[in-house]
Structures are given as structure tokens and as C-alpha cells.
């Protein structure tokens, strides 16, 4: 995490006072009538009209919460347009700046740092990784589908980022089959590509939650896992992911879901099953029926 953060910060130009030209804000498109299916198009239209960089970098809650990275001027244009639309629509404040953020995290602006971050990962990750630890258990936000050692999964990486490593695996004759002969090494290769490109790609949490919570197909070709419990490992005072899961489960798509949502610190007694009262055995003499004299 430290290496990733350091690399991200080093990629952003700063003036003599240490200030960058980037900020981040939270957008609530439901306040002005834009739904999840059209929010990307909306943000792109503001970027094009203003001539400034804007990108949704965190897809948090369908229709309701998106983090947008952009230039100072770009976010100003987005703020003004969203406010105008919300006023016309009768909605509440649709845009707020995220304080203290001046790096366009998870945006394409950082793609020039992917190679350096890959090198950092390569130096720190073991030569082989047991596939059983990741296959069907790890859902990378880069692709928002469970990890697999399949050509289809590798292609899903190439569908969103120009990974030369994955391109060679898929397009050079015999390369995929040769790599598959050593599953531990292939798992490592794909993991490194997923992590280094996630560094400069949006967090697709809406789709990831859909995979976790859906009992049917979560996306074309991607089966839902249908979990019955979500346990966030994080601060109980700020249960961000638990709150997002709870709000997601209120959507009509999950009306029939019966998923329990916990934060490990806030709901520790439930998570560790220590909230059940223990009934001690009573002495035999106390439970024996009374007898006639």
C-alpha cells in the first residue's frame, strides 16, 4: 500500500507551493435524474464540453454515489452543471468535494506509473501462488468477476486495459497452454497484472457487490455467488463497505435477498458468535420434581 501510494503521488505535477491541478469529488446523479446506466456518459459529456479531464474512479452505489477525479476546472464545471440540473429536478446537493485529495487515484492519468508499480510488485510477490487461494475466492475490482485460470478471464483483463503481458499470453501461439502448465506461476502473473493496472483503473464496486450478492447471473457470463453474510474488516466508527452493502440490498434487484451485513469491529459479538447467552446446567436436586411427604 505504501509503495502504491508513493508511486501515485510521484506521478502528479505540483507547483512551487506543492499544489496539484487535481481534486476528487462525490457525485449523486440520482439527485438530478441520471441513472447508473447513463452516469458515465454524463461525466464524459462534461469533460468534452469543458475540455478538462474527468473520470469516474469509484463506482460505489448504483445511481447514488460515484467518486469523480478531475482537474480543478473540470470538477468546477461538473459541480456547476450538476447543481443546475438538481435545482431543475428538485433534488438535493448533487456534488461534494472530497477534502484532502489532490491525486487522481485510480484514473488513467496514472497509467504512466503502471510499469514502475509492476516492478515493485514483482520484487515482493512470491515466485508462485497457490491458485486455490484465489480461484473463485478473489474478485478483482479491475474486472469485477471471480478470479479464474481461463482464457476468458485473461481476456476480461485485456478488455479493459492494454496489458502487454496478457496480450502475449492470449495471442502468441502456444503461450497460454505453456503458461497453464505451471498454474502457480500463471496465477502470480495474472495477479500482478490485476494489481498494477488497478492502480490506474476505476474501482468497480457496484459490479463487485452484484457478483457477491446475486443468486443468479450477475453479468453476462458471470454467475452470482449468492453469499449469505457480508463481513467488513475495518473500523466500526466508519463502516464504509458495510454501509454500501446494506444500501445496495435495498435496491429492487435484491428484494428477495436475505443477506446479513456486519462490520467486524462494530458487530464483533455477532461475527464471533459470542452474543448468545450460555445456559448452565442446573443441579439435579433443583430440577427434580417435588414428592409427596
Please place each PLM-identified region on the residue numbering.
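Alpha/beta catalytic cores of group-transfer enzymes, especially the acyltransferase/condensing modules
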Residues: 1-171, 176-179, 183
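Acyltransferase/transacylase module recognition
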Residues: 104, 108, 112, 119-292
